[in-house]
């Protein structure tokens, strides 16, 4: 189910700007008579607010009394579908004064629930405005003797400073870095341009670092990357910027991650190939700590004999003949003679021969596979070879493989939930539950793995994992005979 985000709402508003907005006067957007329009001026640093969780039967004139108690309103626009004209349950609000916006956010954000709504109203700066992350600077390579007052004096020439804090260890000693928050984005940008790399502080190993502080999402992604690295898991969806990502690419990446995992943790299939549009080169990939699972041939292909990692100098080889879009990898595949002499006996031909027509539709047009295996390498396998289950078709995993996740961020959807738990194993399904009336996330969901060990690894790593101001609650979903899943 589609959800409206602040960024999408802002994009639609830019495509269809309000008809009655005037550049500097302070009118009310909407069907208000001219007598009620104000002649006040908008502050240069006025904040544009995003307002969510609004009943769909309320228009601008109905919302005005709620917001004008905090100050004069410059613009109030309810977002509507560009094609159907239907109310989307959110709006943009701009006050004439910056202080009015701050007061409204403090008094209303998640503090008041409007009639007919299940969740409290959301009032926060829109993405296009000066959010806290756009005004907050990270300052590194400071002298460990510098105090908050000295850091403040260094930056106060560029504007009004709202906060300044030096990061300190448990013993109270400075870590040589600080956070400085200005009152506007322009002031913070000016400080970056003037001070970044401008000097080397006493005792610092390199020049001064001044940059915008990371947002909550960036910090969360970085922590997840670090956690994945500690577990020894390689997950391209976390290691590379993948947005926007198609559903097919996610499913393919998930399947290829499963191919890399085996029941013994020491074998891999050389037939793995990653989409060149997302990964240009892959060096060595550490397989230590990969979740244990039976090897799954990619996209329905029967796997040739598995190969010990000691005999494989390169992880993968290019399918240049069958996949013209793939970029060759730096390592070459070992000769088949070498493979077959490593105490590995070829599969006997007891099953029907593999034909091109039986391949996955994604591999339509593949004419030959001699880039990796000659004809002998495609010898059919025995009937005892386990066949992989269909990817992303089963709604729930076996007993002990289904997780309940609570305290999810409001903006998280099915894709974000999948990417968060993909490092721990093969995901059968993932779902964030939505409110049918408001089309907003209920902030909880479910993830189903194909084996219990992956589920337990995910619980140990992600239960209590902090995202923003919330800590995830991750536990096994109760059996179906219980009335509640948690």
Swiss-Prot record:
RRM domain segment(s): 47-128, 135-215, 401-479
**What CDD domains does the record point to?**
RRM1_CELF3_4_5_6, RRM2_CELF3_4_5_6, RRM3_CELF3_4_5_6
State the family it belongs to.
Belongs to the CELF/BRUNOL family.
Enumerate the subcellular locations listed in this protein's record, separating them with semicolons.
Nucleus; Cytoplasm
The UniProt regions of compositional bias labelled Low complexity, in chain numbering, are 12-24
Task: Kindly indicate whether the keyword Transcription regulation belongs to this entry.
Answer: no
- In Swiss-Prot or TrEMBL terms, this protein is called CUGBP Elav-like family member 5
Q: Which GO terms describe its biological process?
A: mRNA processing
For this protein, the record's InterPro entries field holds: CELF3/4/5/6_RRM1, Nucleotide-bd_a/b_plait_sf, RBD_domain_sf, RRM_dom
One GO location term (cellular component): nucleus
Q: Which PROSITE patterns match?
A: RRM (PS50102)
Q: Which ranges are annotated Basic and acidic residues under compositional bias?
A: 1-11
* Biological function: RNA-binding protein that may be implicated in the regulation of pre-mRNA alternative splicing.
Identify the stretch(es) annotated as Disordered.
Answer: 1-39
Q: Supply the alphabetized keyword list.
A: Cytoplasm, mRNA processing, Nucleus, Repeat, RNA-binding
Give the signal sequence positions.
none
- GO molecular function, a single term: RNA binding
């Amino acid at each position: 189910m589609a959800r409206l985000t602040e960024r999408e709402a802002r994009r639609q508003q830019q495509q269809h700007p309000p008809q009655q907005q005037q550049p500097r006067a302070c009118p009310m957007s909407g069907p208000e008579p001219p007598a009620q329009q104000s002649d006040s001026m908008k502050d240069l640093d006025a904040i544009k607010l995003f307002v969510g969780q609004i009943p769909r039967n309320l228009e601008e004139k109905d919302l005005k009394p709620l917001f004008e108690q905090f100050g004069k309103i410059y613009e109030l626009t309810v977002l509507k579908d560009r094609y159907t004209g239907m109310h989307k349950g959110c709006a943009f609000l701009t006050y004439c004064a910056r202080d009015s916006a701050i007061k409204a956010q403090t008094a209303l954000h998640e503090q008041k629930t409007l009639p007919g709504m299940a969740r409290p109203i959301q009032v926060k700066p829109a993405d296009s405005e000066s959010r806290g992350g756009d005004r907050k600077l990270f300052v590194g390579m400071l002298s460990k003797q510098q105090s908050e007052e000295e850091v403040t004096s260094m930056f106060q020439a560029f504007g009004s400073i709202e906060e300044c804090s030096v990061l300190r260890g448990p013993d109270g000693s400075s870590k040589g870095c600080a956070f400085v928050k200005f009152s506007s984005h322009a002031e913070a940008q000016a400080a970056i341009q003037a001070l970044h790399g401008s000097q080397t502080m006493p005792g610092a190993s390199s020049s001064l670092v001044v940059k915008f502080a990371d947002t909550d999402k960036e910090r969360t992604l970085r922590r997840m990357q670090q956690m994945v690295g500690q577990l020894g898991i390689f997950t391209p969806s976390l290691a590379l910027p993948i947005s926007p990502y198609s559903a097919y690419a996610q499913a393919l990446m998930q399947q290829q991650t499963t191919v890399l995992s085996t029941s013994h943790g020491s074998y891999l299939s050389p037939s793995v190939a990653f989409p060149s549009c997302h990964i240009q080169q892959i060096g060595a990939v550490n397989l230590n700590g990969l979740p244990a699972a039976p090897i799954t041939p990619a996209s329905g292909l029967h796997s040739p004999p598995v190969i010990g990692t000691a005999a494989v100098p390169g992880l993968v080889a290019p399918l240049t003949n069958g996949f013209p879009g793939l970029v060759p990898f730096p390592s070459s595949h070992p000769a088949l003679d070498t493979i077959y002499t490593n105490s590995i006996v070829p599969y006997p031909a007891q099953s029907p021969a593999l034909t091109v027509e039986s391949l996955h539709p994604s591999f339509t047009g593949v004419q030959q596979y001699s880039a990796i295996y000659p004809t002998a390498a495609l010898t059919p396998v025995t009937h005892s070879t386990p066949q992989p289950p269909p990817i992303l078709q089963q709604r729930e995993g076996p007993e002990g493989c289904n997780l309940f996740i609570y305290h999810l961020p409001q903006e998280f959807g099915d894709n974000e939930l999948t990417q968060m738990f993909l490092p721990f194993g093969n995901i059968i399904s993932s779902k964030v539950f939505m409110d049918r009336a408001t089309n907003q996330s209920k902030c909880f969901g479910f993830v189903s793995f194909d084996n219990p060990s992956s589920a337990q690894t995910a619980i140990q790593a992600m239960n209590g994992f902090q995202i923003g101001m919330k800590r995830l609650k991750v536990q096994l979903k109760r059996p179906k005979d219980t009335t509640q899943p948690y």
